Amino acid sequence: MAARPLVTVYDEKYEATQSQIRLPAVFRTPIRPDLVSFIADQVRRNRRQAHAVNTKAGKQHSAESWGTGRAVARIPRVRGGGTHRSGQGAFGNMCRGGHMFAPLKVFRRWHRNVNIAQKRYAVSSAIAASGIPALLQARGHVIDQVAEVPLVVSDKVESFRKTKEAVVFLRRSHLWADIEKVYNSKRNRAGKGKLRNRQHKQKLGPVVIYGQDAECARAFRNIPGVDVMNVERLNLLKLAPGGHLGRLIIWTESAFKKLDTIYGTTVANSSQLKKGWSVPLPIMANSDFSRIIRSEEVVKAIRAPKKNPVLPKVHRNPLKKRTLLYKLNPYASILRKASKANVKK
């Protein structure tokens, strides 16, 4: 949770202006990585396309079992002769050239219904995590020279039309190092995805969130790793790619001011666009547990420790505890040694 009450607005030349904006209440949302990971996985499933294997795959042979009495398995075998293929097993999922086990069907349950309250909570938590520099650096963003997080810039950025204007802005705001990280991370994908129109993979850079439909999307879209979104249509898969918190966000001034209107405050039902929604409050106002248990209020309510406590007497079984048996009957050790000697004779 960001602790600063005010956020400075920077112009397109990355110079601090006189205007300051109060930090929206959504940045005080409790950070729930478990919820964000789960909801991101559910939302990602809704983008899947139904696919299946051919119903004839692995079954296009003339094969029949040889039956019993041949000292071979009763799996169907290819008919004929004159080739290595004849006599080989067919059809079964354990056979070369056979069908797969449990072939994929198009009527699989591909999509998931996502709880809207959990989805809003996850988006709010992802926004709150974007205001913590430690989480941004843990995710791999290069923000060593960034003056302030969350980073808010003037609305002149929304009027950018050319990519070269966006590049100049990113260089001035010391964010180009994060873009160079994206360039250097481009590599070949492992697996068969290379054959399916996704040969390369690379890291992600910052995401630009604007307030009104502007032309800045055309300026930033051709820069590798940079995403652009409208503040009224935020996508959890871009705020927390892979379900991981800590995406670097560049807010425009108008978008930053709309957050209280969209996501509300700590007052119940304060959101104007999301019915019945307000910013979730943390269960513990102070998460420093050691400070709580050492506070005067808690110490006064707790009984002082006893100086000479009377411990209850523990009754032990001497038949199972040999040391206790020897205390009660010292001669038992002699009897035990004598019995062992008799056994050896």
Curated annotation (Swiss-Prot):
SUPFAM superfamilies listed in its UniProt record: Ribosomal protein L4
Pfam family, one: Ribosomal_L4
Single GO molecular function: structural constituent of ribosome
Coiled coil: none
Keywords: Acetylation, Ribonucleoprotein, Ribosomal protein
Protein's UniProt keywords contain Acetylation: yes
Biological process, per Gene Ontology: determination of adult lifespan; translation
Modified residues (N-acetylalanine): 2
Keyword Acetylation: yes
Family from the record: Belongs to the universal ribosomal protein uL4 family.
Protein name, as recorded: Large ribosomal subunit protein uL4
Organism: Caenorhabditis elegans
